[in-house]
């Protein structure tokens, strides 16, 4: 599980009940270098350096095991890199509002829209918290705020600004992951938000064409934190993705391989 930039593993912890319900998956939630409790050394100066740190983590902690990877936003770009690096060892790829076009000026983005504003809620919050919440919230509500407070805000208050600044200054990967591999046959789930004004959804639809076994869902009333905006729909899609991978790895199934 790989989170996005400026947050930490807690952004994705709300998905854990869905993943745990099947009872067969060990979940590993990373804190990327410079975020959460992971320190970024001076060598972390680009997205490529972060990607290599994640590759090293997989090699050191998973050995030769097969694994699935789910990446959100910046973590989606890193998840794609893992597919390019490990190939058939990756059982499935989950992309949650992933970065597809690294250069912001080249992204196809919808206009910024707030579908439901709650000025009373914002006025009740700490001003800094209200600003961070309002930047991404598509539907402002008490429940939506509480999910943001518990999942996103801790990481936003903890990241190493110097380290993240170095990464952001060298943001694109040197080689697009899909240019490194000819094909990937595992189940791919791509979830985008219709109102995601950070990475958009149109570039994500174009990326889906690079994967032969890809399920795409553009969630309505969802922005860049689509899993916080639409937790029920996100959970159902993730459950289906897990089911697809479990079907493949059953004994006798075509392409079955060792369970994680």
Describe these PLM feature segments:
Residues 80, 84, 90-124:
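Flexible "cap/lid" loop of the alpha/beta hydrolase fold
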Residues 1-40:
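Conserved HGGG/HGGXW glycine-rich cap/lid loop of the alpha/beta-hydrolase fold
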Residues 184, 190-192, 196:
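Short beta-strand/loop motif that positions the catalytic acidic residue
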Residues 71, 75, 79:
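Gly/Ala-rich beta-loop-alpha elbow adjacent to hydrolase catalytic centers
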Residues 49-66:
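Conserved acidic catalytic loop of the alpha/beta-hydrolase fold
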Residues 222-235:
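Catalytic histidine-centered segment of alpha/beta-hydrolase-like enzymes
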Residues 177, 186, 200-209:
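Short alpha-helix in the alpha/beta-hydrolase fold that links the catalytic acid
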Residues 104-106, 124-182:
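Conserved alpha/beta-hydrolase catalytic His-Asp/Glu region
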